[in-house]
Amino acid sequence: MYKRQIYPDHWGRKNEHQDKPSKAFHDRWLNRLKEVVDNYKPDYVWFDFGIRFIHEKYKKDFLSYYYNKETEWGNEVVVSYKWHDLPPGSGLLDLELGRESELTHYDWITDTTVHDGSAWAYMKNSKYKTTTDLVHYLIDNVSKNGYMLLNIGPKPDGTIPEEDKNLLEGIGNWLDVNGEAIFETETWDQYGEGPTKMNEAGPFSDNRAKLIYTAKDFRFTTKDNFLYATALGWPSKDFTIESIYKLFDNEIERVELLGSADKVEWKHTRDGLHITRPDNKPCEHSYSFKITRKESL
């Protein structure tokens, strides 16, 4: 919901005086949001720019109204915001076409698009990101305490373009094999290791630098007593994950490659976790090694 008093022509000229919204506007803003919540029961309310001009009382009233629906409906609800439009912790920080470069203590989300650029609607002859690009994006975000909100652009008749479908199916096929390393996981002590680093972070940083990951880039997630090390390329036959070095004897019980029934040979030393991978790939794009840790030392 854009604030028309700041952008009276929607995407046109800006009101440089930045008149503060009136009480009537505030009331209409809050009532419209409540109407959407009551009639459609959304799981997620996503705010673009502009709500920083909404009075604090009205923001609190909306957040209280919506978050209390979580108990009434019996399912989780989420609000995201940009910049400093809401206080930290009151919602999910949204980084449009960008992400964090390091592991964060707070949750955040990227809204990005399947188009290789910043198109948010259907475009003829558009260039697309690859499935590998999007899978890598998802893995990197999750390892840093982030999420990915992915946009596709339907045609005017409502149908989904084949290119968009293929990308979604490709991500789905990868998750069928490796979803265990993504869904309901938590971050580890560090997000990953490898030579590929982000030079810029934050909103719109994707437009300034495109990353090409290698087989030496790994991202980490955890769940229960499992540590997942996901390689962003097919590693060499014998490789070492230096971050997973030995602290105590018999820390690790088993190493598996998700999607593969082949045995994984491994050795744990002070230099890291040395792995001999199977010969055959279980999937494409990225490869998740499931490391079972002893529950008690």
Residue positions per predicted region:
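Mature catalytic domains of secreted/periplasmic carbohydrate-active enzymes
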Residues: 3-297
